[in-house]
Structures are given as C-alpha cells and as structure tokens.
Amino acid sequence: MHSFNLQKFQFIDDLNIKSISKDITNLSIIYRNYSKKIKSKELIKLKQFCKKKRIKFYISNKIEECLKYDLDGLYIPSFNKQNLTKKLNLNRQTIIGSAHNHIEIRKKIEQGCKIIFLSPLFKTYKLKYLDIPRFNLTKMSFKNKFVALGGIGEKNIHKVKMLNIYGISGITMYKKKPASFKAGFNKF
C-alpha cells in the first residue's frame, strides 16, 4: 500500500491570510476569483506569507500575474482550453489544471499540466460524480499526478484512502467544519 501523506490544495477566493487553513502541513493555496480585481499589495503580502510558511501559491487563470509576481505556478480550470505553456518559465513555475473526463485530461496534458485535479470524486450539487472505481479507472490511462476534488466531506473522507493519488482538494472542505472532520482530514 502507499503512504497517506497527501498534498493538500485549498482554493481561496479572498487574498486574506485568515482564510488559509490552520494546518499547513503539505498545503498549497490556489487563489481563484474571477470577479474581483487583484490588489497587488494583498497578493504580495500573501505570497510572502506562503513563502515564509513553505506553502506553494498558485493563481487561477491569470498568467500575467503569475509571471509578474513570480508565483509558484498557474492553475488552469477545465473551461480554459488555451495553450499557455509557451509563456511560463517551466523551470520555476508549475502548471496545474482540472478536468472531468478523458478528453479534458488530454487537453490538460497538452497544456503542460504536471498535476491534474479530477473532479468531482463524490456527489455534488452540480455535476455527475465519478466515485472511487470510475475515478481510479479514469486516471489509470495517464501517468500524471492526480488530485481528488469535489464532494469530499465528513461522511466520505475515509474513502479517499482507496485512491492512489498525489493529493486531495476542496473548495468548501476548509470552511468551518466540525472537529471530527478536521481530525479525519489532517490524518492525510
């Protein structure tokens, strides 16, 4: 069996240090907000905090800001089909992206993604979910690192151990949760 020392990815929509999880072990932050204009002072402050705490800091879909502020990498959502690899310094920055099926996974590989978020793992209010068997079958065809995303909650966090994955992620899983959920999640 493999170890359960998984990389944890937290999506944030606010450039506020208080929104970051208290447990920073193996944590990476993805800033994802398409409605607000980025305030450079806040972005620099968060970048410095992440560097000090050894947290990787990615920005979603904003290649100019990724280059300008020399962030750890770029997150490409599943709806972005552009090829951005020519613009980034791939020696210093990592491209990560999300996908829902084989076609989107191939597109993310073409875009140069080193880590692919495959979603949704469990039932969510939006999409048809993969669940454990289909998730494993989908990722078997590819050699990339995969992160489980979507629908992970208190009732199904233990099922993640059945996956051979690089990391785990969530959008709402880091927001005010019961102590039992945080304890179960922190075991990873």
Where are these regions (language model features)?
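N-terminal targeting/leader regions
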Residues: 1-24, 33, 44
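Hydrophobic faces of well-ordered beta-strands that scaffold small-molecule active sites
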Residues: 4-12, 27-31, 57-59, 74-76, ...
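Short, acidic/polar
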Residues: 10-23, 61-64, 100-107, 153-158
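Structural motif
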Residues: 23-24, 69, 111, 162-164
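Conserved, mostly hydrophobic/aromatic
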Residues: 29, 66, 108, 116, ...
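Alpha-helix-loop-beta-strand connector modules within alpha/beta enzyme cores
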Residues: 42-58, 81, 86-102, 129-153, ...
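Glycine-rich phosphate-binding active-site loops on the catalytic face of alpha/beta enzymes
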Residues: 74-86, 115-131, 152-188
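Internal catalytic-core helix/loop-beta-alpha segment
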Residues: 94-126, 130
